[in-house]
């Protein structure tokens, strides 16, 4: 077996490295810079029932230690994705597992998008972005309430019984463990953690926030220690597969998340400054494994 191969929720991956949702859209641009077949899987941007225009510009801002973004889930909607984006990936990368990231404004939206996303043959995982605001609860993110997380997970698994469903956890909670356990009770096949942290920057010239939305999700190196801590906490209480994300800029960063408890990793903000980031991290894994005396990536898997 190749030293980089591993298995997550029963799906074989040629490497443990994926892109993070929203950092490579549906793959066409990233494919100009790296061979997508190097990836363990490709994660599409979060897709909703209807097309979304997203927030007006500016939607991103570089900040100390990372990026702030408030794109507003801009996407063409599930029907377009099923008709055009996923077929393009299937035609050009037939052996590449696709992670279908989904989002919504209410639980019914999530369930319907998950059901439709799962019909695509090349979608091997469903990733549920539960950092979205719950309109019925005054805008509070779905992922902050264990009761909501458990119920939503159960409802999604009811319509997607034959493909792994991974819940992507928000770090914007007092305690992450109850949220992870709620997802497990609901039948989640795995977890993706962590999503971005809410932040803000103010332009001193204008006295206004730098992002049109005011606040935005903080990603990048600044959140890496938080991801390590939360993954470690959750690994202590569950054997669910974990895909780690948060400030992965190097092979050593990836290994740190895996030592904490992840079986695979996603690369997000690093792609903004370096379009070859995923390739570079994959190429650096074997030398880093040799340096720190790891035999293979599969030893990090919770599926022994």
From Swiss-Prot:
It is found in: Cytoplasm. InterPro entries: Aldolase_TIM, DHO_dehydrogenase, DHOD_1B, Dihydroorotate_DH_1, Dihydroorotate_DH_1_2, Dihydroorotate_DH_cat, Dihydroorotate_DH_CS, Dihydroorotate_DH_I. GO terms for molecular function: dihydroorotate dehydrogenase (fumarate) activity. It is an enzyme of class 1 (oxidoreductase). Its EC number is 1.3.98.1. Belongs to the dihydroorotate dehydrogenase family. Type 1 subfamily. PROSITE patterns: DHODEHASE_1 (PS00911), DHODEHASE_2 (PS00912). It catalyses: (S)-dihydroorotate + fumarate = orotate + succinate. FMN binds at residues 21, 45-46, 129, 168, 194, 220, 246-247, 268-269. Binds 1 FMN per subunit. The active site is at residue 132. The lineage of its organism: Bacteria, Bacillati, Bacillota, Bacilli, Lactobacillales. This is Putative dihydroorotate dehydrogenase A (fumarate). Homodimer. Its cofactor is FMN. HAMAP family: DHO_dh_type1. Keywords: Cytoplasm, Flavoprotein, FMN, Oxidoreductase, Pyrimidine biosynthesis. GO terms for biological process: 'de novo' pyrimidine nucleobase biosynthetic process; 'de novo' UMP biosynthetic process.
